[in-house]
Amino acid sequence: MFRKILIANRGEVALRIIRACQQLKIATVAVYAQAEQHSLFVQQADEAYCVGPDTAQSSYLNREGILMAALLSGADAIHPGYGFLAEDAVFAQMCAECGLTFIGPKASVIELLADKAAAKKFARQQGVPVIPGGMQLKNEQDLRTKAKQLGYPVMLKANFGGGGKGMRVLASDHELRHQYHLIQEEARQAFLNDAVYLEKYLPHARHIEVQILQDHNGHLQILGDRECSLQRHHQKVVEESPAAILQPQQRQALYQLAQRLMAGLAYIGLGTLEFLFTGQQFYFLEMNTRLQVEHAVTEMTTGADLVTTQIQVAAGKTVQPKIATFKGHAIEVRLNAQPQENLLATGQLTKFRLFTGARVETGYREGDQILPYYDALIAKILVKQPTRLQAVTKMQRCLQRVQISGIGTNLPLLKQIMGLPSYRANLVDIHFLAHLVGDAQ
């Protein structure tokens, strides 16, 4: 087992990893930007090192500074959390070259799966269905030809995209020509690579994902499924476990696809296989090679401790192949400092009080500042009940009791969602929120 782990992240996920390390009696090292020197996660860690000024680019994405902190502290492993360097193959390789264990798959596997077009090609080779399209584009003429073959509407995506960035729904040749270079530039700035690809747009799909864990011996555990269809601009807002829409035979078919895909990968650690589900068919979207923001809903319904097990497997623990069973239904909402679309609210949390009957994951306290340099997530609020409808009702009560002031949030939207008859009846798809609030896709 590791003696000391450096956590290359911030906020609530850093605190979640610290808790897991404490359970395993592993010392923890935090890294932080100057603006966050008094943050809760810094105070909770056994040691802490400043790795740069306020911006994420200069601190939490500072590979060399983070590695230097790991070596100075005597850490023997680095946990990347999610976001930032969690799916950075270069960073994973640098860790290996420094004699540090990167808690995640090998750099070569991250590199394969980070390239969305390459990942879909791999899935096809494994006999896993993918959305029509998905081939990398050579030039603008190739773009128009493939769009005509697929038929409008189409989705234009960045090869190395993520977090809702670098993708657009396009309904005509005119829109395609107009958006092509804009998406390339967005991809270049966000992911340092302007490669893009086209795929067919599916108008009534649901987002279903499978949580997996695999050890060094290839022993695969399927730790349940989630539905994450409620999204704004391709960023998840509400997540549930299990995916209540699935019938037993559909769930079995989904897990067989997951097993087929994983059989071809020398994969170690936690991962999430994302699919679109429409017309009784699953289409592979991508694989996230890290801990997910929404991992806690799976923990609540399966009883698994995903972060602790992730660390143990990275340290060489063997697990037995299994398919987890569910107990109850869990819902997570993301309370964001985002009162309007793509607008990050900043300022002081003058009041911040959450309902004690829910599981809450947050890196903030009353009086803390929401800074403009990082993501909008303030807290994850989770509930579990015997049935989905009971869980929705409990979440509704929890949100009514949230007291937060000083900054704008999406709390009104979350309350609205929980009260909608269509949501309560589980009549949703990935465009549900866009239609609800009038967002352009």
Per-segment meaning from a language model:
Residues I7-L24, Q34, A48, L71-S73, ...:
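ATP-dependent carboxylate activation and anion-phosphoryl transfer catalytic cores
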Residues S59, P80-F84, S108-L112, P132-M135, ...:
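Glycine- and other small-residue-rich loops at beta-strand/loop junctions that grip anionic moieties
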Residues L100-T101, A123-V128, N159-K165, Q235:
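Acidic/polar active-site rim loop that often engages polyanionic ligands
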Residues G166-V169, L176:
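Conserved glycine-bearing catalytic or ligand-binding loops at nucleotide- and phosphate-handling centers
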